[in-house]
Amino acid sequence: MSRPIQALIDPAALERNLAIVRRHAPRSRVMAVIKADAYGHGLLCAAEALAEAEGFALLELDAAVRLREAGYRQTILLLEGFFDIDELSWIEQYRLSTVVHHPEQLAMLEAVRRRATLDVFLKLNSGMNRLGFTPTEFPAALEHLKANPAVRQITLMTHFACADEPDRNDSIAAQLQCFNLAAGGRYMPRSLANSAAILRFPEAHADWVRPGIMLYGSSPLAHTTAEQLGLQPAMTVSSRIISVQTLRPNDGVGYGHAFRAGSSMRVGIVAGGYADGYPRHAPTGTPVLVKGRRTRIVGRISMDMLHVDLSEIEDAGVGSPVTLWGRGMPVDEVARAAGTLGYELLCAIAPRMQRVT
């Protein structure tokens, strides 16, 4: 028998969330971001649910190869590009597209100029200051690619730093202006908008949008919930109570007795801890569902177990179902209580946790 903790993946939710992307950007092609094992949801499971997207974006070359070998014919984009010249033969063989964001990649492309045919996304650093050519470097990089016979098609791209922050619209306007100036009057396909920009900045939709977190049912916006956006959770992490303890006043529970009972109370011990991907730093008070009713985490999260307050759920006992996040318990709410983001919780699901659909 396996432990009762599992991640239930809902392909229908992925499909519905993709439909919301299209509703917001009806004239753009969709590059579904499925990096980090599709944000913890499973690469091929997510790809099947998102098969209507015109493209997939990820980081790992081996994952891109798996997609092609599974029969997906869409554009498949490597978001960090290639790291070694030997990877270019794989990129060509599997008809992958690659981001180019620094001069060393240009040099490697130059070395195979007579031996390859590649589609390239040229990245501008418009203010994120992470990857990409500066506005000064960008025109020369573009001309370099245009002169290289190995390069078949060029798409221009950038990435927004503050699209999720409603009081930082000036930052987005500045990045958009920077991109438009660097691109000039050249007609080439363009890709700018991540999830937050898809929802907030239609002027940035361009030819390709790149939704990530919104596909998985988490909100990219700090002050708007996934439910308000119509997004549905694609992952529900559930478990069961495996033991019940009755605490007397001032009894502690778990390591360090970080929580002590103020009065007599029942505590449920749940199969699930930080080795499964639940955040160790989640404090007492972090919300959880037991038998579909809200209660709270108490005490310190341990490697394999956590503790829930059963004071108001008198009929709960060993075997009672627990929802750690997902349907009925938004991952963003749990993340906020733990001082992190829904992105991190979804991506942190441990390999030992069973995923089911």
Curated annotation (Swiss-Prot):
GO terms for biological process: D-alanine biosynthetic process. Its cofactor is pyridoxal 5'-phosphate. The modification N6-(pyridoxal phosphate)lysine is found at K35. InterPro entries: Ala_racemase, Ala_racemase/Decarboxylase_C, Ala_racemase_C, Ala_racemase_N, Ala_racemase_pyridoxalP-BS, PLP-binding_barrel. The keyword Magnesium does not apply. Keywords: Isomerase, Pyridoxal phosphate. Its EC number is 5.1.1.1. One of its GO terms (cellular component) is cytosol. Substrate binds at R130, M303. It catalyses: L-alanine = D-alanine. SUPFAM superfamilies: Alanine racemase C-terminal domain-like (SSF50621), PLP-binding barrel (SSF51419). Transmembrane segments: none annotated. Pathway: Amino-acid biosynthesis; D-alanine biosynthesis; D-alanine from L-alanine: step 1/1. GO terms for molecular function: alanine racemase activity; pyridoxal phosphate binding. The active site is at K35 (proton acceptor), Y255 (proton acceptor). NCBIfam families: alr (TIGR00492). This is Alanine racemase.
